[in-house]
Amino acid sequence: MRLERRVLEREVFMQYFEKQGNALIFRQDGETVRVEPWQKDSLRVRGTLLSEIEEGSIALLDPEPMEAEIELVDELKATIKNGKIQAVLEVQPWGQKLRITFLNQKGEVLLSEIANGGALCLRAHDYRALKGGAYQLKVSFDSNPDEKIYGMGQYQQERMNLKGCNLELAHRNSQASIPFYVSSLGYGFLWHNAAVGEVHFGTNTTEWLARTTKQLDYWVTAGDTPAEIEEHFADAIGKVPMMPEYGLGFWQCKLRYYNQEQVLNVAREYKKRG
């Protein structure tokens, strides 16, 4: 009886991970997570709860064909490697929840989701059901207090290093939110989700929040220099074409004019100066 129970437990554990083509799949307790190579030295992570992962993309281009190194290490651990980046997927015995850690080619930790469980019932992937089949989703990562974070678009704030900042993930008249950053640890991260939300770059944890979404979706790339990381990002989302010649030159730009006389004064001054 005891032997049969051990065999049954082993069969259940073995169902956590599977290799599906060029992707590593995790399934447990209604959650499905898919990790796959997405351009050079990069991995894309998608996940859902009680549904199938949706195909398609918001910003990422279709990846070029490439082979990933996938290893099912044991019942509770699997890895997937693409060039300079490796993801280690581990099932934690308490609660059987997944934790993903990203390493560079030297085996150094770049980024790691938080550990699950404990008295606070913490979860790296926290789904909160909403009406209509969507979720409010929070994804949490461990934070290196010495890490420096750069990017995220244009915000009305004075800090170049975003460590310690809280940012709204939404476009406004005074801000352009681009949820991608470059880390001083040697990686780039794209929150591939169009939902309005928030990001908190704390010194203890980094938390991404999507207020309404169907699935988890983020992309991580590794590089030896910021320029290499930016190059991977450009390859993943598409490179900006050269502006046509007729669009080059001086642009007269002002947020607003209060009346017609202000506009005419500008026009008169241009005419005066030739």
Regions found by a protein language model. Give the residues of each.
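Short, intrinsically disordered, charge-balanced linker/junction segments flanking boundaries
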Residues: K271-G274
